[in-house]
Amino acid sequence: MQYTRNTTMTKTDRDTLRSLHGRKKWEHIWAYYKLPIAIVLIVVYILGYAAYRHVTKKEDVLYLGLVNITAGSDLTEQLTTGFAEAQGLTKKQQVDLLSGLLFSESERAEEQYVYASEMKLLGAVSAQRLDVVLMDEYARDRLLADDYFLDLRTLDASFHALSGLNAGGTVLDISDAPFVRQAGFSGKVYLGVVQNAPHPERAAAYIHYLFQR
């Protein structure tokens, strides 16, 4: 037979409680009600955390990836926050940046890091967490060979007139875009939009933003 503890205070217990003061009184209350108190505290914590997450959670309106491209703090600011401000986005909306991806033809490159970068990029595409990719020439050739990019002209008819567009319309040379040119890259920088981009209209707006100045 199982017995459960009676957590209800008797008259004697209540009289004892009235006679106690300060720390001893709280210890007496805790002895009888520690389980209900613990449950209430856990519930309050869960509700508070959920409310905090709801208030502070950011909405990703564009996913941007950098492959074989290292952006300094100024360029990163222009590529992310600058676009958000130009679009008139709220403080809860942001450009999500996936940086540090390395595809290298150098034999000295760390194979594990390159492989991890490739898997990270593939995972982002599979999860539809990538829209726009900025890359160097080597990464461009690698990703073009794997048919990663859509025809940019399907996003906006005006893109037919872009001088840096390749023959297939899938990759755009953005080396002369103001932000990119000011960054002083040694080689050319290219842009592509992945086939299953979750925000194609925003990606088109991003291309306009890069060339607006």
Role assignments for model-derived ranges:
Residues 1-27:
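N-terminal Lys/Arg-rich, disordered targeting/topogenic segments
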Residues 34-53:
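Hydrophobic membrane-insertion alpha-helices, especially the h-region
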Residues 60-70, 95-99:
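Short, well-ordered beta-strand elements
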Residues 69-73, 138-142, 197-198:
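Solvent-exposed loop/turn segments at secondary-structure junctions
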Residues 78-137:
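Extracytoplasmic/periplasmic/luminal assembly and interaction segments
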Residues 113-168:
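Extracytoplasmic "Venus flytrap"/periplasmic binding protein-like
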Residues 186-199:
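A bilobed periplasmic-binding-protein/Venus flytrap-type ligand-binding module shared by bacterial periplasmic
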